[in-house]
């Protein structure tokens, strides 16, 4: 067994993981491909580089991300502590000087005796023809037709060296690093092609997605059920020879509650359509445009093909009867359950690239969603992430290879703080595994770490957090069964409901936050 834990990726999750391991007096080898190679979005050589907004969102406990940050402060997160130190004025939000932030994280990790930072790319491409053919034929639920290649958009230092006659050093493979050792993969949404290929081989054909094209997710209790109704297409519809009373009794007693349906009349639909086609969209990066739009069309783009296009697509009303009128609606929007608790619903077919404010404005025009609370807005961007519900448990541990953990956005958590949280959880559990295996090895039980089975480590103590905490709820979300899994950020919709119903949203979120912090305090004492 190797006398260290390997972390691949020096972003937010990987940097947090390396710190948490090192502070527990275990050696860490942290692999970072910069400056040897840069992704299309990265530009400096420091660890924990922030490439988008410099905001870590609200500090208020009545905000889901604010609660998550407070939990991480209680758990001695290096990155949140550093963010607090280099904060810039931002009202109630935590915003940072991005250059100072990444510089400080790099300096602190370099100063730790137990951390060795290795500036090399990890990943073995193998036969490029085989790889290309495989990935071009790969179809993840009709969402991806080919693997995006960052080589088309950026050129590595390594490639330039080859052209100048400088010898290229071989990259290190994931297979090599994980042999008889524990590995955390924290390579983010722009994971390199070579490592992506190894992850595909590790997780299987359906294990890896290359972009995020997600519809908005809505909190169920904010849906107006005096307008919306339950039912599946065709079975909910009133039969030609079925009288109204019989039909109403049938649908009332029906167990087919897979969808919440939002009916629209002609006037409502045309008002919605007019606002949708003129709404503002997010400008995509050049490297994102090709792969996203060839695999999944945004609803606003589809709408611009004609006023009735949506009515023959995701908003087709065939197979439904509006309980209020007894007639087929002019158009219908369907919501599908998104989590096992049944308190989050996604908008079917509403993958979108609209700005967040525009999503709130336009989608609230849909009858039944006039007061909707959006747990997550729709997004379309390059985002490499694994099918976590199939592959990981709540500790971010790979089920079929127990010596491998994942952390960060590659697991399907979305956001800076969420990535940090996942890195912390993965690190704590990798330490637990390391110490257990080290004890076993010392007692000569000859337990190997490569390709560990769940059975082989059935006695391994796992470090999980209460589901009432935000850090625990995120871990549970990515590990829970979900046939339509999409990345998720911190939001109060993923927490268990309070025993009492509270209409005042601020009061409700305050009580959820108090409960979370009490639960976390309880296990830390």
Question: Model-found features: residue ranges?
Answer:
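An active-site-proximal "capping" alpha-helix that borders the catalytic cofactor pocket
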Residues: 419-433
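Helical element adjacent to the flavin cofactor pocket in flavoenzyme catalytic cores
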Residues: 98-117
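C-terminal auxiliary extensions adjacent to catalytic cores
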Residues: 485-525
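Active-site-proximal substrate-binding core of FAD-dependent oxidoreductases
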Residues: 431-438, 446, 451-488
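A glycine-rich dinucleotide-binding beta-alpha-beta segment and adjacent secondary-structure elements
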Residues: 346-413, 420-421, 463-476, 487, ...
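N-terminal FAD cofactor-binding segment of flavoenzymes
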Residues: 19-80
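Predominantly flavin-linked oxidoreductase catalytic cores and closely associated redox partners
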Residues: 115-128, 166-335, 349-356, 360
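Beta1/beta-strand and adjacent pyrophosphate-binding region of the FAD-binding site
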Residues: 2-13
């Amino acid at each position: 067994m190797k006398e260290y834990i390997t972390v691949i990726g020096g972003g937010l999750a990987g940097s947090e993981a390396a710190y948490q391991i090192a502070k527990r007096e275990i050696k860490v080898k942290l692999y970072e491909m910069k400056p040897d190679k840069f992704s299309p979005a990265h530009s400096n050589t420091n660890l924990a580089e922030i490439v988008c907004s410099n905001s870590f969102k609200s500090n208020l406990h009545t905000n889901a991300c604010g609660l998550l940050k407070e939990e991480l402060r209680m758990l001695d997160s290096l990155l949140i502590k550093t963010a607090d130190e280099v904060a810039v004025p931002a009202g109630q939000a935590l915003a940072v000087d991005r250059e100072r932030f990444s510089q400080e994280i790099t300096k602190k990790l370099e100063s730790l005796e137990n951390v060795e930072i290795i500036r090399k790319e990890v990943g073995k491409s193998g036969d490029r023809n085989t790889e290309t053919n495989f990935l071009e034929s790969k179809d993840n639920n009709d969402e991806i037709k080919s693997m995006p290649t960052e080589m088309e958009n950026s050129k590595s230092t390594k490639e330039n060296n080859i052209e100048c006659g400088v010898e290229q050093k071989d990259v290190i493979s994931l297979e090599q690093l994980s042999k008889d050792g524990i590995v955390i993969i924290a390579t983010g949404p722009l994971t390199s092609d070579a490592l992506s290929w190894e992850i595909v081989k590790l997780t299987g054909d359906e294990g890896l997605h290359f972009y995020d094209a997600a519809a908005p997710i809505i909190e169920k209790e904010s849906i107006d059920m005096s307008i919306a109704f339950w039912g599946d297409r065709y079975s909910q519809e009133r039969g030609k020879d079925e009288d109204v009373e019989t039909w109403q009794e049938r649908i009332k007693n029906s167990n087919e509650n897979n969808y919440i349906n939002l009916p629209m009349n002609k006037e409502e639909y045309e008002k919605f359509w007019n606002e949708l086609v003129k709404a503002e969209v997010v400008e995509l990066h050049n490297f994102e445009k090709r792969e996203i739009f060839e695999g999944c069309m945004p609803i606003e783009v589809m709408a611009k093909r004609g006023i009735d296009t949506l009515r023959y697509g995701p908003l087709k009303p065939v197979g439904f009867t509006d309980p209020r009128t007894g007639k087929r609606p002019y158009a219908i929007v369907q919501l599908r359950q998104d989590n096992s608790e049944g308190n989050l619903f996604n908008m079917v077919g509403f993958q979108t690239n609209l700005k967040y404010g525009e999503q709130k404005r336009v989608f609230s025009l849909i009858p039944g969603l006039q007061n909707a609370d959006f747990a997550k807005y729709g997004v379309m961007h390059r985002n490499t992430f694994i099918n976590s519900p199939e592959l990981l448990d709540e500790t971010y541990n790979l089920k079929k290879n127990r010596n491998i953990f994942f952390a960060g956005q590659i697991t399907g958590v979305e956001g800076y703080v969420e990535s940090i949280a996942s890195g912390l959880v993965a690190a704590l559990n990798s330490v637990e595994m390391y110490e257990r295996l080290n004890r076993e090895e010392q007692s000569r039980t000859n337990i190997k770490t490569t390709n560990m089975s769940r059975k082989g480590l059935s006695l391994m103590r796992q470090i999980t957090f209460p589901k009432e905490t935000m850090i625990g709820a995120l871990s549970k979300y990515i590990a829970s069964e979900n046939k339509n899994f999409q990345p998720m950020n911190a939001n109060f919709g993923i927490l268990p409901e309070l025993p009492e119903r509270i209409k005042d949203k601020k009061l409700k979120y305050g009580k959820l936050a108090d409960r979370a912090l009490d639960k976390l305090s309880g296990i830390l004492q």
